[in-house]
């Protein structure tokens, strides 16, 4: 993918066997006409996520059109500069038996992408490394907790432990995610 995308003229939407991702510079009402398989009565799904907002802080391109491979995002990632920098800094020490030689897939965050696409890159890396999608999302985007919004000690320990491994990706942001097996939605601590 890295070699094909260098020319900026090719984007792999997904190679998943569990989900189909449709993209188009069109409204939600136009989807059925553009993708006729959506009107086929034999074509069914247990879940669907839709993102129909146009880009506001980046020039629209296929690579930046949402939804991404695992994520649809509405909002801003205000910590994006630090998130990208820390992810790049830790790439040299990352390892996982599930992905083989990490050097072959670096950089994990593709350059020139939006904040949403960068978050999706890291989410995809964590899931392909063996974490479940809900685990990876909770690690990247921890929920807010305080005296007015208490959480269990186990969950608090989960967030404290993961804060050592990964800094939070904070917005304000609303996020939808799916890997074809799980689907979920959440707000970040500022959403």
Where are these regions (language model features)?
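Short coil/turn segments at secondary-structure boundaries
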Residues: 10-17, 63, 134-141, 152-153, ...
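Active-site-adjacent "gating/activation" loops or surface patches in catalytic cores
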Residues: 37-61
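Phosphate-interacting basic helix/loop segments used at nucleotide- and nucleic-acid interfaces
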Residues: 153-173
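Conserved catalytic micro-motifs used in adenylation/nucleotidyl-transfer and phosphoryl/amide-
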Residues: 48, 60-77, 81, 167-190
């Amino acid at each position: 993918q890295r070699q094909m995308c260098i020319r900026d003229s090719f984007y792999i939407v997904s190679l998943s066997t569990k989900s189909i991702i449709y993209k188009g510079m069109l409204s939600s009402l136009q989807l059925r006409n553009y993708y006729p398989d959506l009107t086929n009565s034999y074509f069914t799904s247990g879940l669907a996520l839709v993102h129909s907002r146009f880009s506001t802080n980046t020039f629209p391109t296929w690579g930046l059109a949402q939804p991404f491979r695992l994520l649809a995002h509405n909002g801003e990632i205000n910590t994006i500069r630090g998130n990208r920098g820390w992810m790049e800094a830790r790439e040299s020490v990352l390892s996982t038996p599930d992905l083989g030689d990490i050097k072959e897939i670096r950089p994990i965050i593709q350059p020139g992408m939006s904040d949403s696409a960068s978050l999706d890159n890291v989410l995809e890396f964590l899931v392909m490394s063996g974490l479940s999608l809900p685990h990876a999302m909770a690690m990247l985007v921890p929920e807010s907790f305080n005296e007015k919004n208490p959480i269990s000690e186990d969950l608090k320990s989960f967030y404290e432990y993961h804060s050592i491994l990964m800094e939070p990706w904070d917005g304000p942001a609303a996020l939808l995610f799916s890997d074809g097996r799980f689907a979920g939605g959440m707000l970040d601590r500022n959403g």
